[in-house]
Swiss-Prot record:
Protein's job: Component of the 90S pre-ribosome involved in the maturation of rRNAs. Required for early cleavages of the pre-RNAs in the 40S ribosomal subunit maturation pathway.
Biased composition (Basic residues): 86-99
Localization, UniProt: Nucleus, Nucleolus
Pfam families found in the cross-reference section: RRP36 (PF06102)
Name of the protein in its database record: rRNA biogenesis protein RRP36
GO terms (BP aspect): maturation of SSU-rRNA from tricistronic rRNA transcript (SSU-rRNA, 5.8S rRNA, LSU-rRNA)
Region of interest (Disordered), residue spans: 1-118
GO-annotated cellular components: 90S preribosome; nucleolus; small-subunit processome
Bias-annotated ranges (Acidic residues): 69-80
Gene from which this protein is expressed: RRP36
InterPro entries: RRP36
Length: 278
């Protein structure tokens, strides 16, 4: 029995593209249907199939794998930094101790004068200093300073007089507590002793300067060839004599009594430690 192959027939009015589409859509037909097509139609059919496959193709595994790897890398990085931070905080918490030494960065050089918490630093001590009395500018001339600030003695004297008037006033004393009265008495004593020391210093400088003037006058007159410089012991004697002359009778008695007691105490100490004679 002879088998005849029938070629697919189509109208000439139909375009080649329509026929190509019908052939491509008919998937059940055999490969013999494509034998009737020209090379140009086959080429266009191949292009069409490629376009369809590209549009219908799912996203590539590589891109998904790359994305997954990126996500996993970012997650792992975050986890790594979080672990590092947690480790650091744990180490800090574990290392912090009351008796642990203070930590300092090794990148900065250690200062020569180390600041210790709780102690006054060098900056604080030299922050509010008077440059007139700074050692960098040489020794201060005490005689000149005393002359420049002599007016402060009058202010101190007035302050002492006011404090004494408050202590003598009974009404004001009743309003004050015992501690306030004692503090006021101490202030009066400290101010008075400061004034006395300044007066004694002025007296000693005056005595020494007067002695120098006398020596210079004697040298000018020709009575003396070289000046005579006083020793420390001689200076003390002259100053003591001048003090006694300026003192009142009651003050002299107090000074003499103090000296007598001091002398007696010295004698008793010598008697205690003296070995008995055999």
């Amino acid at each position: 029995m002879s088998t005849h192959r029938f070629k697919p027939s189509y109208d000439e009015s139909e375009s080649e593209d329509d026929y190509l589409g019908s052939v491509l859509d008919n998937k059940d037909e055999s490969d013999d249907d494509f034998s009737s097509l020209s090379f140009g139609a086959l080429n266009s059919a191949q292009k069409k199939l490629r376009e369809q496959s590209e549009t219908q193709r799912p996203p590539s595994r590589k891109s998904s794998k790359n994305q997954e790897s990126d996500d996993s890398d970012s997650d792992s990085d975050d986890q790594f930094f979080e672990d590092k931070k947690s480790k650091k905080t744990k180490d800090k918490k574990s290392k912090r101790s009351k008796h642990a030494p203070a930590e300092a960065s090794f990148k900065r050089p250690v200062p020569k004068i180390r600041e210790i918490p709780g102690l006054k630093s060098a900056k604080d001590s030299t922050l509010y200093t008077d440059i007139r009395f700074d050692a960098a500018y040489g020794k201060a001339d005490l005689n000149r300073v005393r002359k420049d600030y002599a007016f402060l003695d009058e202010l101190r004297q007035k302050e002492i007089a006011e404090m004494k008037a408050v202590l003598k006033n009974d009404k004001l004393r009743r309003k004050m507590s015992q501690r306030e009265i004692e503090d006021l008495e101490l202030q009066v004593k400290s101010l008075q002793s400061r004034l006395d020391t300044l007066k004694n210093r002025d007296l000693s400088t005056k005595i020494i300067s007067d002695h120098k003037k006398q020596q210079m006058e004697k040298m000018k007159k020709g009575e003396q060839v070289n000046p005579y410089y006083l020793k420390k012991s001689e200076q003390r004697k002259m100053i003591q004599k001048a003090k006694f002359e300026t003192m009142k009778a009651s003050q002299r008695e107090k000074v003499m009594e103090r000296k007598r007691k001091r002398k007696l105490g010295r004698e008793f100490r010598q008697l205690e430690f003296r070995e008995p004679q055999r």
